[in-house]
Amino acid sequence: MKFEKLVPSVFYTNLKDSFKLFTDCLEFAIGHDETSAENAFCVMEKDGLSMLLFQNKEYAEKVYPEFRLVTKDIEAVYKKVSATHPELLHPNLNKVTLRPWGAKEFAIKDEQVCFIIQEWP
């Protein structure tokens, strides 16, 4: 078997609430826009990564996913995020921290999703 990419889905009560985290903070772009459709959704894209974001109150209330984004320069990412969007820093991991498993990590979140930013040695 060969796969090209994994494209996860995240559900929001109000899809526009996702834009602060995805477009403003993480600098994803909307690759496909159906935000005005009856069953609103969009595809966020950046650096070969894609995520489907859906407006669905029922699923948004049931699911709170966590993802990891791996970088080679966590200090630069942290510096930018903490300067521009400090309110998105996760209270349990709001500084770059060396974890017992060897990765440096910090986390950001909104009301619907959490991203752990990682750098491996």
Question: What kind of region is each of these model predictions?
Answer:
Residues M1-E4, Y59-Y64, P100:
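Short glycine-enriched loop/turn motifs at secondary-structure junctions
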Residues M1-F19, F67, P121:
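N-terminal beta-strand motif that seeds the catalytic metal site of vicinal oxygen chelate
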Residues V10-S50:
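Core segments of cupin and vicinal oxygen chelate
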Residues T13-L15, F67-C114:
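Vicinal oxygen chelate
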Residues S36-A40, E61, R99-K104:
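Short acidic/glycine-enriched loop/turn segments that link adjacent beta-strands
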Residues D47-M51, E58-A60, I74-V77:
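Short, charged/polar surface micro-motifs in flexible loops or helix N-caps
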Residues M51-F54, A107, F115-Q118:
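Conserved beta-strand in the GNAT
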Residues N56, L93-R99, E119-P121:
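Acetyl-CoA-dependent GNAT
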